[in-house]
């Protein structure tokens, strides 16, 4: 059976959504039906970093435990943000350092930069990322320019 190394977050009791119980080394199976964000799939992340960065908007687990896992069977992917498979087992708990505020902001800017084409936002984002401009005034100006552009696009 071919497997893929992935990463899984659990709570302190090795549980995930709806108190699904995990045991290190034991395979769990799902039918592979429905949308990725459903009980038909076992969810995981491509990297430890992505698991920790996405936790607040996905599982929102307080004090998560992070595991290396093996995924197998049918697989689905959500544009690289998370994945799911029909077979999954957690194999080894790993220690981690939680992302810093700066790392979270950088990640958010990179995500927004992938879709926002507003020139003032891009200028500000590049300045923030390269460290040349991290001023609040420029951040607010970029925010308002992007909001105005979004409102104009929605009205069109």
Model region roles, listed by residue range:
Residues 1-156:
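Short, glycine-biased loop/turn motifs at secondary-structure junctions and
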């Amino acid at each position: 059976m071919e497997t893929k190394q992935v990463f899984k977050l659990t709570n302190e009791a090795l549980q995930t959504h709806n108190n699904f119980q995990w045991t290190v080394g034991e395979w769990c199976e799902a039918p592979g039906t429905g949308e990725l964000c459903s009980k038909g799939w076992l969810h995981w992340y491509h990297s430890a970093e992505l698991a920790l960065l996405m936790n607040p908007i996905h599982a929102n687990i307080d004090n998560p435990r992070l595991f290396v896992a093996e995924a197998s069977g049918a697989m689905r992917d959500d544009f690289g943000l998370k994945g799911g498979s029909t077979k999954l087992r957690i194999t080894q708990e790993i220690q981690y350092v939680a992302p810093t505020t700066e790392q979270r902001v950088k990640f958010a800017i990179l995500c927004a930069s992938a879709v926002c084409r507003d020139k003032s936002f891009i200028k500000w984002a590049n300045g923030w990322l390269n460290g040349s401009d991290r001023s609040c005034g420029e951040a607010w100006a970029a925010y308002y320019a992007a909001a105005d552009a979004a409102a104009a696009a929605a009205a069109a």
